[in-house]
Amino acid sequence: MIKIVDYGVGNIQAFLNLLKRIGIHAERARTPDDLDTASRLILPGVGHFDHAMEKLNESGMRDTLDRKVLRDGIPVMGVCVGMQMLATSSEEGVIPGLNWIPGKVRAFKSIDGFTLPMPHMGWNQLHPERTSQLFRKGFEKSTQFYFLHSYY
């Protein structure tokens, strides 16, 4: 069962509607018990990193999420600030992230003195530098992915 983590920050109904439209059943998870039957997770989020982490920590779901993802190995997809929360920390705040992906989330600024337009928006190809569980099945070199983000 796909569970969309509802910790008070995010566009939960948009995800439920999208998945329903493509024929996939998903449910909202508001409590740790709601996560018991999760076989996949979506962690949405809108807004500031610290606010989102604060709300998740207050929700009481943090320990259950850690167990489901780290011990049980269920797949999780973070969207917007939900994806940023998977990291150790963010330069946008001081509250620690989930630390499921080691690293610090940073805002795009410039590369070699060239200021980058923000947000980074549009269709681009990916060129993975190393083998990743995310891309274990691979994809064709011509595959395009849509990006809309200001952080990496």
Region spans (language model):
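Structural signature of beta-strand start/N-cap positions in the alpha/beta core
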Residues: 25, 40, 75-77
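Cysteine-nucleophile active-site neighborhood
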Residues: 47-121
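Short acidic/histidine-rich motifs immediately flanking catalytic phosphotransfer sites
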Residues: 35-45
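Short gly/ser/thr-rich secondary-structure transition/capping motifs
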Residues: 21-28, 59-60, 125-130
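N-terminal beta1-alpha1 ligand-phosphate binding loop
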Residues: 2-24
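Amide-donor transfer/coupling interface in amidating biosynthetic enzymes
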Residues: 35, 70-71, 103-152
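Short acidic low-complexity segments
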Residues: 27-37
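Short glycine-/small-residue-rich Rossmann-like dinucleotide-binding loops
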Residues: 9, 45-47
